[in-house]
From Swiss-Prot:
It holds the Pfam family OMPdecase. GO terms for molecular function: orotidine-5'-phosphate decarboxylase activity. It catalyses: orotidine 5'-phosphate + H(+) = UMP + CO2. NCBIfam families: PRK00230.1, pyrF. Catalyzes the decarboxylation of orotidine 5'-monophosphate (OMP) to uridine 5'-monophosphate (UMP). Coiled coil: none annotated. The active site is at K62. Keywords: Decarboxylase, Lyase, Pyrimidine biosynthesis. Pathway: Pyrimidine metabolism; UMP biosynthesis via de novo pathway; UMP from orotate: step 2/2. This is Orotidine 5'-phosphate decarboxylase.
Length: 228
């Protein structure tokens, strides 16, 4: 998984998630992302079943609480044997450090910076800052790096900024990936797999472009080809 492409399993339940995954041949299991919708609906059993079937799992819960609580949550989630887990960088340096200590190197921790759905104006108003999105992502990445996390989540448009200030092995995972003929949905800061690669992304998260396609396998293969 040098340059993983995660399919976001944004489905309401286990059955619809596996109905989708069964469209892929058994020898071509994609890496998958499980977010709040599916995890909160099904609980740990969705992760357990995915792992039993050989899927590599990225658990996207964006943990954001006081350091003690986040550390305890990370320790609990280690039992699920997922490969990646998200925390939110806005929780601060101490929270991220606590998560890193709790992970004990057994899981890749990814710090979410700014959501791909947020605009510059909304970020400034909500977070009461005069910074640009690029400045904010750079600052949050520097904190994440200081805390010892394994990588960040940002829009592909900020991947190059992150690449410039982090080591080569620091993961730069980018959602907000669309093909040229796709609708943006609720994401604002988006680009294509090819452009994300040019910007320096080391991994992609792709949801609706694949899950809502008439031929998901072909679209998945096309994205892999563009990104490799």
């Amino acid at each position: 998984m040098n340059k993983p492409v995660f399919i976001a399993l944004d489905f309401p339940n286990l059955k619809t998630a596996f109905d989708f995954l069964n469209k892929f041949p058994s020898h071509e299991k994609p890496a998958v992302k499980v977010g709040m919708e599916l995890f909160y609906a099904e609980g740990p059993k969705i992760i357990q079943q995915l792992r039993q079937k050989g899927y590599k799992v990225f658990l996207d819960l964006k943990l954001y609480d006081i350091p003690h609580t986040v550390a305890a949550a990370v320790r609990s989630l280690l039992a699920l044997d997922v490969q990646y887990l998200t925390i939110h960088s806005l929780g601060g340096l101490k929270m991220m450090e606590a998560a890193v200590d709790a992970a004990e190197g057994k899981i890749k921790l990814l710090a979410v910076t700014q959501l791909t759905s947020i605009s510059a104006n909304e970020m400034r108003g909500t977070q009461l800052t005069s910074a640009t999105i690029e400045q904010s992502v750079k600052h949050l990445t520097q904190l994440a790096l200081l805390a010892g996390v394994d990588g960040t989540i940002s829009s592909p448009l900020e991947a190059n900024i992150i690449k410039q200030i982090t080591p080569d092995d620091f993961l730069k995972i980018t959602p907000g990936i669309r093909l040229f003929n796709d609708q943006n949905g609720d994401q604002i800061r988006i680009t294509t797999p090819k452009k994300a690669k040019e910007f320096g992304a080391s991994g992609l998260v792709v949801g609706r472009s694949i899950t809502q396609a008439a031929d998901p396998l072909s679209v998945y293969r096309k994205i892999l080809e563009e990104f490799e």
